[in-house]
Amino acid sequence: MHFSNLLFIGIMTLGTSEFCSAGPLHAQCKVEWYFSLPCRSVYEALVTQIKKWRTVSTCATGGEKCLYKLQSASVHFISAKHTTPVKKYVDDINFRLVSYGFFTHCHVSAMSVSETWYAVTDHGTNYCNLYNLMEGSGLTEAPGYKEITSDFLCTQRSSANCTVY
């Protein structure tokens, strides 16, 4: 094989791997949350909220607090999808729940990633996918609530308007 062919294949492989996985050039969000609650309580609140917002009717007054679909759930891991009501874009959502403090506290690592391979910006949609579930479930008012994220970890986080997205 000629060097130019190998070079072309190498460049295409690197370029393809960047677009097929979430990375800095892909619309996504990673958030860490901490609660002074057992993970079972956090798990139940999130799963209940995902199920509550499964139909389009909960978006009748605007926003995107609808069309969530629970994929799988255990007290340690929740997987869901969110479909935007207008453009029908799909985002993959995961919550990993880890107990600490003799099972009295919960650390949640959450991620939302756009399935649309060419999505680079998202107006904070992936952040709102996660935050809206936290707020809707009442967990933002829970004891010990703490959120850690940034624009580096969440596409357009600082400009997100979660009443719209």
What is the predicted role of each segment?
Residues 2-5, 9-165:
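Ser/Thr-rich, low-complexity intrinsically disordered terminal regions
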